[in-house]
Amino acid sequence: MPDIDALSRPRRLLVLSICCMSLLIVSLDVTALNVALPSLQRELGADVSGLQWTVDIYTVVLASFLLLSGSTADRVGRRRVFKTGLVLFVAGSLLCALAPSLGWLIAFRAFQAIGGSMLNPVAMSIITNTFRDPKELARAIGVWGGVVGISMALGPILGGALVASFGWRAIFWLNLPIGLAALLLTARYVPESCAAHPRRLDVVGQLLVIVLLGSLTFGIIEGGHDGWGSPLLLICFGIAIAALACLLWYEPRRREPLLELRFFRSAPFSGAFAIALAAFAGLGGFLFLNTLYLQNERGLGAFDAGLHLLPMAAMTLVFAPLSGYLVSHVGPRLPVLLSGVAITAGGVLLTGLTEDTSLAYLFTAYVTFGIGFGLVNAPITNTAVTGMPRSRSGVAAGIASTGRQVGSALGVAVVGTVLATGSRDTGWWVLAGCGVLVLVFGALTTGRWARRTAESAMARIAEEDAAEPARSAG
């Protein structure tokens, strides 16, 4: 296996292509599954809660293990963990395709998510270690972002076509050939790499994150159906609060914590995490509600429903690179504020939907929301790493990615629970509220004052890290 520094440019591009294959199957799996929800609901007799869990169990497990997978890859080898992730994801997809009931499907989705947690963050680490030249790395990340946009555009259409032709199980069958091809190519062409100073395993922190996310999501989905004051909801929220308190107490006391809470002293970093939560909660809720609206209320088939979502996905594809350009030239403030305005406006427009709403009005709402979501990703990544030293930027970006997944899970949980109470219009207002949060957090955490907090926070962290070896030696 050749050394990374000795790789030719064609070989580096091949490594990038292999990493993008993993991103493609994960992204297609998520976007295509949303279109299949009504078909799955009919065949397996699922209620709204069951549909929520089909989507959210994957996202919750993925978010819970993202940071662990990244640190494990740094320690035992990125190529090794990436291959393991592909094996688990493909095996999980096979099990999902064969699931005999809703309960088994949810369980297999959790298994699939463990593999998924080892793919995208580890693939990004492979890319950053393969492309050492800053300009080449910027172009590689641009290609990576383009694949996300392509999957969002193709996912609903491809998912709709597969469901219409072969049923919802075909979505999972599709992962097998792509995943196996990526596995074989990884074994042959991707070089191994490890971090020079890998972080230690934080078992307690990992367990607390799982308890926190699991109890919070479970409480919203299950407890919310019995009313927001139900005993189950209160118990779950109590467990979540206790887990959060333990996490806030325990993590600062570890020399190498799973969650680097000191980063939250930086206003741009805290803002990036909050914006990621809000924006992806809006996206998760948008895909969940619109799939059910188009197929159950407007009576569209799966393929037609996928086509109807194309304007939103197309705007995301178009405005994502524009956002990156704006961030590099004028900073993250303008695109994140425009994103907040567009997501809010899109959510407000969606509140007026009925089964007879004209396509012109519907597509206007979809285009507006798509513009907002297309603009938000680049500012999230940029504000997360603002002021961070290079050695810390990967950890910061990983925490921001966890925020994206947590937001998506909470978005589906909240709007699904609202929908189960018989109030779809309230669900649309939740999406508008997500846009307002993006706007507010963007305004507060992207100005000069915020940048100064990032500089002071990183200086303080550097001082603390420098003092730690001295205390240990003493």
Locate each region found by the language model.
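Intrinsic disorder in cytosolic terminal tails and internal cytosolic loops
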Residues: 1-11, 195, 445-474
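Transmembrane-helix bundle of Major Facilitator Superfamily
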Residues: 1-188, 320-323, 330-344, 348-355, ...
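Helix-boundary and loop/linker segments of multi-pass membrane transporters
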Residues: 4-12, 98, 198-200, 226, ...
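Short loop segments and helix-boundary regions at transmembrane helix junctions
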Residues: 10-13, 133, 189-207, 227-233, ...
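12-transmembrane solute porter fold
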Residues: 12-28, 33-35, 48, 231-239, ...
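Interfacial loop-to-helix junctions that mark the boundaries of transmembrane helices
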Residues: 49-53, 103-111, 166-174, 200-202, ...
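C-terminal membrane-cytosol helix-exit motif in multi-pass small-molecule transporters
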Residues: 176-195, 210-222, 239-254, 438-448
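Flexible cytoplasmic inter-helical loops of multi-pass small-molecule transporters
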Residues: 191-207, 253-261, 451-462
